[in-house]
Amino acid sequence: MRLFSLLPLLALLVVQAAGQSEVTSDDPATDAGSTTNSTTDTKPRIPSQDEILGQMPSINPIRTGNPQMDAFYMMFPALGSLLKWGSLFPAYSILGAIPDNLQPTAAASKVVLVLADDATAKTRVARQNPPPNPLGQLMNWPALPQDFQLPSMDLGPQVGSFLAQLPAMPTVPGLLGAAAPVPAPAPAPAAAPPPAPAPAADPPAAPVPDAPQPAILGQAALQNAFTFFNPANFDASSLLGQSVPTFAPPNLDFVAQMQRQFFPGMTPAQPAAAGTDAQASDISEVRVRPEDPYSQEAQMKIKSALEMEQERQQQAQVKDQEQVPLLWFRMPTTQNQDATEEKTLEDLRVEAKLRAFERQVIAELRMLQKIELMAKQMRSSAAAQNGDSPYRISYPLSRTPIHKITRADIEQALRDDYVRRLVNKEAQRRARNSGINTQKANALKRQAKSQDQTLSKEDIVQIMAYAYRMANEQMESEKGKQDKVYAAYRTEQNPMMMQQRQWSEEQAKIQQNQQQIQQNPMMMQQRQWSEEQAKIQQNQQQIQQNPMMMQQRQWSEEQAKIQQNQQQIQQNPMMMQQRQWSEEQAKIQQNQQQIQQNPMMVQQRQWSEEQAKIQQNQQQIQQNPMMMQQRQWSEEQAKIQHDQQMAQQMAQQGLMMTEQRQRQWSEDQAKIQQAQQMAQQTPMMMPQMQQRQWTEDPQMVQQMQQRQWAEDQTRMQMAQQNPMMQQQRQMAENPQMMQQRQWSEEQTKIEQAQQMAQQNQMMMQQMQQRQWSEDQAQIQQQQRQMMQQTPMMMKERQWAEENPQSVQQQGPMMMQQQMPSMMQREVEDEDNKAEDDLVGEAGPQMPENEGTARHKVDALGVGGNKRKKSKSKSAPPTVINYYYAAPQRPVVQSYGTSYGGGGYGSNAYGVPRPVNSYQSQGYRAAVGNDEVDEMLRQHQTMARTINPKQPGEVGGSESQKSNSNPPTTLTPAPQEQPQEHRVHKRLAHFHRFGREAGLNATTSKGCGCGRLDCLCGRSCRCGRRGLESRVVSSRTSGTCQCKASHRNKRSVEYGTLETIDEGSLNELRREYKLGLKEITLSPDEDPAEALMRYNAASIREALERASMEPLEIGGDQYEEDAQQEPMEEEQLQHDPNTEPQYNHKDFVRLTTSTASPITSTTEAATPTGSDSTSEATVTPEVTTTTSTSTTTTTESTKDEGLDMQQDSQAEAESSHVTKSISKQEAEIHQLHSIVEELKNEILKLNLRCSTIISNNVAKEPVTEKNPPVVEEPSKQEDKPKVEEKVIAEEQAPVEQEEELEEDEDSTSISTTTETPSPSGSYSTKPGLSLGSPRVDEQSGSSNKLDYDDDNNWQRILANRGYDTDYLTKSHERQFAQGQNLEMPKNCNYDGNGSQEYGPYPEFQADEPSTDTEGKAKRALSVKQQAQLLNAALNDSGSDSSDGTTTTTTPSPYAMRGKFVRRRSTARRVPIPKIGKASDEVWVRSPRQAKMPQRPKKSMSKPKKQSSQVTTQATVSSTKLDSLVDVLKDLVRLQIQKEKKSSLLRTQSNNLSKTKPKSIKPVKVIKRKRLRRRQHKSIATTIRSPIQTKA
């Protein structure tokens, strides 16, 4: 059906489809546009966009409710919207009438439909109960303003007949008026009529009959619709009057009949399909409640006759353009690129939408063609099988070019059941596949696919209106243009006469056009060669920036400027000039050839002019596809050449051409001569002048000669004088021109000799240009054709046109035109190349990654699943993809609490934090173990863990170095100097493990060398030798003996983001967790569990070290503590203090720098190991603490080694149980065996100690009495300090404290030793805790006689799982009485010590309140134990006093953070419960791992105080009794205060009191702090011998 017939259908469709909206005034623009192509002389009034859009129903993705229509619209959203909103397509009629229930009900209240059987109607329109008819929409679609003239809409004669039949024509307006319930006889737009009736309805069939009635209906309906919709906006009569003739479509009859015909039974939903008139009544009357002052119906009746007439007239026109292509709106888009110059931004936007819409429509038409073709095949196959199909259907689409497809074609195609079926199937498939995906994409993905319905109805209407307007403008412009073009063709045909005429006309036009073109880019759209020439000239002038006249006028100024420019150009030779010049020459030659080819150009009668025009024409042709005439020109080149010759031979042309050419020749010669002279004078200027003259000669000469012949003559003189001036002027006018000219001049410089010769040749050639023009015309015809065919050539020409360079280059091109055609070709080739280079489009910078996201780039090229992020893929190559310096801190998955920067506490293993363990330093890529190791070493954060320490470096110096150099940058620090805490820890480890246990590299996990720097990344020193030689060099497994050196899957220090095997992950956790300072417990989490969970690796390592290294009970820790309180304990304190010192702060740093976990881990672990082994003797405090926190208990066990070992074992077991880490379990079992060994050793040591104590008791009691006294004050002093620290720690992570306390309790056996351990753990408070333990140890030494007894019961309790650190005399009493101690076994000590107090509170309270004797006894026993241990260790020479190690072990926990402190606090906390008095502190010391540590110290001969402690312990034992009484009182007071104070405060008080109680421990703690801060090697030295003993 013709578009007009379609239009009514579309209107109906619109009414139905858009029926939901009151009025789907389909784009008036669209209809008009489609009509527009049909030439409508009267420019219809285009309703304002508001008017149009106001009537448009909101275009939701077209949902009609009609499954077929919906399927069609889904499949062809653009096409459907075009047909629907553009009113170009009776979608419903094609696809079948809309079921009544689906009929959109518009404002039903406004329209009263009187349905009656229409006797006249051939087919009764099925009454659509939801009346909103497509007709209503058709009526709406008169909303298509008058503008829309559907030129090609031929409603089939059926439509006319239908309309005639439709007695309810008034109903049409009613329908229109009521976008609503109008049942519109055409529920299925006419297009939809079943194929059988289709013939009548076929658009081609009845365009004429349609026209008259549709005109009437359309106009009346449209009027009514308009008046109804926008009575004010649309003058229905005017709109309809103008537009109706354009589209007669509103043939309700036609639509209805089409529907009936084509879809008699199309959709059951359409009860009254063509065949079935279940709803037999047609619309006999539509009564619209007049919204408008006048009745639409009346007006419709009034206008009906007039409109009928108009529509008849329209129909005649429609016949001419019987079928308006659906893409009628495509013409204006491609029309004049020049038009864009005058287009407003809004127009450009609309045009962009229009083009996008056009592309969409084209794509959908192609798809529809494919579907139709497939349907054709299906039908043919079905017919072959079943015989002939019931009716034959022609498949127009597949045979019709897309741009010629009309609505009728689509209707006819959709008439086919197969096509509809295929469309439905495809739509269903898409709905299934893409529908869900689209929803997902829209909902879930940023790359949400835009819905198929990209354009809203408003957009489409706007687009169509714009297209229609453009079409009208185009038609108008094309009329004149066609006349001009025809004139041009006639000129070509009659070159002599036409050339003469056109030449005069063209010069006038050119001048006018130049002005107009300058003023009116629309003139460009006219695409008149004259205009184009004018525009080209204008462009030349504009390029020159000086209008032709200005150039003429400003010769003097321009000369000066040009001379200057030339000088500048001369100064600035540009090699490009040569290329461009050649290119320009090629272009100019091409242009000349085209000009030669184009009689129009010949008419200019100057090759220069012709060349300029041809260039212009070519450019415009390039710009204006309309100018495809270029090919015609090229084809006509031969004719044109002849014409040119003829024209040139023309007397007028001969005169004009001859005069101009003679003048040009003279000018050119003069210019050339001048240029030669200038060139001789200024070789640069000469070629430039020549080139410019050539360019100007064609351009300027054309302009000047055309405009001012006299001026041309003067210019000949001027040209002789001023050719350079012209060029200079142009150059001055156009810096680009200048540059181009510079290039050309440089080219000319280079080619100057050639050009000089060429200039002569050019003289000759210009003389010969006619021949050349002919020859070149042919050659360049081919070239032009090539160029036309070659988009680059077209682009080049456009580019040349766009760029003044091209125009300027035309000058050189002019010269080249005189040059051989071969040179031209070469130049053109160069031109193409240059254009490719110059005009080339930007391509993807990474073409190989063109379609992929950057994160998918395989930076290493290792391959793998490209769709997966390499981080997530565990590919065989171990790749740490630090892809590039990430602009933002990459998220690091925290594998441990401290790993990953921010991950403390419960979220330790949780969601990766934005905090980058790599310090936001960006990712670097390393492949392979060596590269990874080296990179990690260089990586400061990782280097902390990996960097080998120079064994010679003392902890203090190294720590200072590393402190100075925090790992803040990813730039590989030479050794990635570790942070202070790491360095301290590393030094501590090094001193403890490195020196003392460095030789012991037998640990299963680590070499036991205690070197954090171990090449294997472990805290083993075995690789130190190699590391010393090559610190940063990638470690080779050869250097390191430990397994870790060969990292199969992942080494702890590799902070890779890739998946890590469990073992490696555990190692990572151990290494990085060792750096933890504090563990944040979940509210309901048991501290012990948390400790085990977080510290399993650390515990394991500590146990390993304990097994590997001697237990150091020694007084180094005490000495460190004592150093703070300069007393005897200073001697004892020196070793452990170093480590505890940095434990807290350094651990904090460690925690902060999370990346340094290994170092801190090593230190912490090392203390743990050393303490476990040696600490029993020397550093029981630290060991115990460490054991408590991790498995330091085992280390402490050497003091109360059995008990501590059991505790540590229990802790280890619980930790491995908690973590369920098989590795840890194995290690724990190993640790258990080690603990057993340690227990045995400790028993032996105890025996020795008992022996030694018996010897030393007499001596030491006296000695120790004084220290205890001093201890008490110092304890009291320290209590506040401890309390403060404890408070801080408690406040910080109470949970950690609890964990510490738990560990302490669990280490109750090593309570004595563990007290130092807590201080060690505490690295913040290490001095205090250690100090108090040391005091205890001293008193313990004095008590060593009691120690045997106490040691026995303490050991028994420790074996039972009590934390010996917290054992007090009251506990001893309870134990003696066979009572269960009221202290928790391996209690989780809340930061508040609540759990610890759970058992301890009574026991602690008991200590002061129950029996001072118990305290004294316990203190004595602890001291005795310490003495015995120290004596045994010293005697046995087994320097199990790993005071250093012990400190180290606490250190890891200190690294753990407040955790360690809390342990110290926890141990002290029990005392607070006992009392705040120094006695309570003393009670706290009863955890006298510390005291035993002193004995350990005495045991560890390397530690001076070990022996001293023994002596002192013996002496102080007597004093301890007195002190115990005092402490009892203090404890009572403290308990009272504790009751008053909060648990945190109580704990802090207890801690502080505990320290006061063990005055020396306080000093020791202080000294330990100092030493930790100082990281004195002395402590390390002392520890090392002790460790050696172990």
Swiss-Prot record:
It is found in: Secreted. Its main location: secreted. Residues 268-280, 1151-1195, 1307-1319, 1435-1452, 1505-1515 have a biased composition (Low complexity). Residues 493-788 are annotated as: 12 X 26 AA approximate tandem repeats, Glu, Met-rich. Residues 32-41, 957-977, 1205-1221, 1577-1590 have a biased composition (Polar residues). Residues 23-60, 184-212, 268-294, 843-875, 944-983, 1119-1221, 1261-1352, 1375-1515, 1538-1590 are annotated as: Disordered. Disulfide bonds: none annotated. One of its GO terms (biological process) is egg chorion assembly. GO terms for molecular function: cis-regulatory region sequence-specific DNA binding; DNA-binding transcription factor activity, RNA polymerase II-specific; structural constituent of egg chorion. Residues 1-19 form the signal peptide. InterPro entries: DEC-1_C, DEC-1_N, DEC-1_REPEAT. It holds the Pfam family Dec-1. This is Defective chorion protein, FC177 isoform. It comes from Drosophila melanogaster.
